[in-house]
Amino acid sequence: MSVMGLVNQAVTWYAASAVLAFVFAMHKPLSGAIAGIGGAVASAMLVVAGGAVLLMPERIHGGMLQFLHLTMRVGGVNALWLLAIGLSALPVSLFNISWHRHPQVKANGLLVNLLLAAATCAVVVTNIGSLVVMAEIMALCAAFLTGCAASGKLWFALGRLGTLLMAWTCWLVWSTYGTLELAQINLQAVDMMQNPLLWLPGLVGFALLAGAIPLHGWAPQAHAGASAPAAALFSTVVMKVGLYGMLTVSLAGGVPPLWWGVMLLALGMITAFIGGLYALMEHNIQRLLAYHTLENIGIILLGLGAFVTGVATRNSTLMVLGFIGGMYHLINHSLFKTTLFLGAGAVWFRTGHRDIEKLGGIGKKMPLISLAMLVGLMAMAALPPLNGFAGEWVIYQSFFKMSTGDLFIGRLLGPLLAVGLAITGALAVMCMAKVYGVTFLGAPRTKEAENATCAPWLMTLSVVLAAVFCLVGGIAAPWLLPLVSGAFPVQAQVSSVVSQPMIALLLIACPLLPFLLMIFFKGDRLAARSRGAAWVCGYDHEQSMVVTAHGFAMPVKEAFAPLLKLRHWLNPVRLVPGWQSASAPALLRGIALVELAVLVVIVISRGA
């Protein structure tokens, strides 16, 4: 089957399974099985399609989206986004089958698979207007998946603001070029400088969807109250479509100005640092992971910002390094954040708690989930040999290249960005230690944690599968990075002083070194050892006498107190009249439902 056929079949499977899941929604396990199996098959097709594009000599594939009559194009860049969506949605779909067996869980197959279908269409359509419509359908589905009226209300309000900005850009572009087809726009603007006033509203609108700080208000609330599969899709699919839109408007209509790339770099650095800092303060594991998603969105923006800066300055080496680093980290983030959200969901499934202060000792109760979560957390902290390390290392190289260029702004920003990213990495390592230590080590703090059992086998399989993807993405990085580089048709001399097999061996050896040192330096064991209760100054030892998440983060909280207060000082919600009204959530959800229905009918009728 051709690449275009695979994409068409994937969208069809998503849509058909969504409809069938809705039909059988009253029988929740059956609805979940239909949505999960259909979503898994469609996601596997996207992975095959994306991989085929990267491996084929012919990198550009064009055609029509079946039943919708929308022109689509699958090139190297589109293929990377298809991989990011498919690799995340595959374990999420499998996980969702068992998730529907929990008595407190509502059937979500219609919204989840409709979201995935819209996201797939969004990253392959060739018309900027179609991109906005598909992104809107996806965002509305996500708003209903938040599981909380307050967070859904905030997402709907901010999302409509972003949609208005995107629509404004569409109107400006139509008025200027007479078309919304990206290929025709770029043909008219070949070798010309971009008019940023046309595209800036769209950039802000897509940045809001991507959760770039300070446009991130919806993200932590939406993740905290949503189901684990939905929260995973928010981070790995919805926000990635926002990044796709940001990159699209950055490159459309000619060569972007230098300040555009610098703006993306600044936005990425602010988002990465603030997201990592706020994550360390959280105890709700899904809210914590949401802030870490913001951190990684910032890191991806740093890579894409370096790429756009290279385009503006016609520096091919900076272009390639920024593109490889940003895009590889985009895929890697989808993998390890899927691992973490699904792992957190498996823990909730057995304990009913998302607050890590109420857990502890889960590692002994759920060993495979614990191991997979450790892999995901190490990848999140960019520790070798996991996949998070590879993408960030290439982004560091782009900063080093920037600091040796001819432009003063590059020589100024390169070292500053490298130091900022290093500090952000240190915060991520602290967060890794906090989450794993407080949740999976130590003694259980509640009866639910003490009585926890292993998760259902399909849940465990999904989490372990995502963790294996993280490991493969790190060890195989020397061979995968050239494929990512080939997705963008610019060649540059970017060489390495170490061979690819040697890099892979070093990545494998890094985590083994501590164990080798332990074996080498260990002394003789005592012939007889006695065991007793821990000494706590004469008091009886209690399970609560362990390191808490609050105590672990307290030094950083005191050091950065002014920055942490910003989210309270700069909260725009308090300024909106009627926002706290009890009737506001129901009213906004009603409007969202009508808008979603109208958009779906319009898209279907256009295809008919």
Give names to the regions the model predicted.
Residues 59-67, 183-187, 394-409, 479-498:
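Membrane-interfacial helical/loop segments at transmembrane boundaries in membrane proteins
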Residues 72-86, 194-206, 409-425, 496-514:
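Hydrophobic alpha-helical transmembrane segments
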Residues 1-12, 16-110, 178-189, 486, ...:
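Transmembrane helix-loop-helix hairpins at membrane boundaries of multipass inner-membrane proteins
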Residues 37-51, 161-170, 373-385, 462-479, ...:
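Hydrophobic alpha-helical membrane-insertion segments
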Residues 91-101, 106-131, 140-454:
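Hydrophobic transmembrane alpha-helices and their helix-loop junctions in integral membrane proteins
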Residues 2-6, 69-78, 129, 185-193, ...:
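Interfacial loop-to-helix junctions that mark the boundaries of transmembrane helices
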Residues 480-505, 521-608:
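Aromatic-capped, Gly/Pro-kinked transmembrane alpha-helices
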Residues 28-41, 153-160, 286, 290, ...:
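Alpha-helical transmembrane segments and their helix-start/interface "positive-inside/aromatic belt" motifs
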